[in-house]
Amino acid sequence: PIPRMGGLAIFFGFILSALIFVPLSTPVRGMLLGGVIIVILGIFDDIYALPALPKFFVQIAAALVAVLMGNQIDILSNPNIFSSEPYWVLGIWSIPISVLWIVGITNAVNLIDGLDGLACGVSTISSMTMLVIALTVAEPEVALLMAALSGGCIGFLPYNLNPAKIFM
C-alpha cells in the first residue's frame, strides 16, 4: 500500500517558511489557522474516513476563521461587457461568498487528487500564478505565502508523480 498524508510534508514546509519569512498580520494568522484546521481535518479523515457532512462543517468553520480575520472578497470584476459597472461591490455578501469560495476550492483540490501528481501539479501552477500576480500588484505577504506553498508543492511533486510513492 502507498502511504497517505503526504500533504503534511507540503504543510510543514509551507508553515515553517510562513512563520519565518511572513509578517504575522491578522489576515495571515487567519489563513494559517484556517489551514491548520483543514490539515487536522485531513489527518482525521485519512485515519477514520469521516462522513461528508462533518467534514463540510469543519471546512466551513476553517473558512470562517480565515474570512473573519480579514481574508474576504470585497469586490468582483464584472465580466459583463454590456454593463456600465466594471466591478461588483459585494457588501454584506462578502463573507458568505468568501466562505463559499474557500470551501469550494478546498473541495475542488480534494476531488482532483485521484490521479498521481494532479492536485499537487495544479496547486503548484495556481500558487505560482498567484505569486506572480501578488508581485505585480505589490502584495509582499501574499507573494511570500505563495512562494512557500509552491516550494512545498514542488518539493513533494517528484514523490507524487506516477507511480506515486506517497499520496497527498
Predicted regions span which residues?
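"…together with the soluble PPM/PP2C metallo-phosphatase catalytic core" -> "…together
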Residues: 1-168
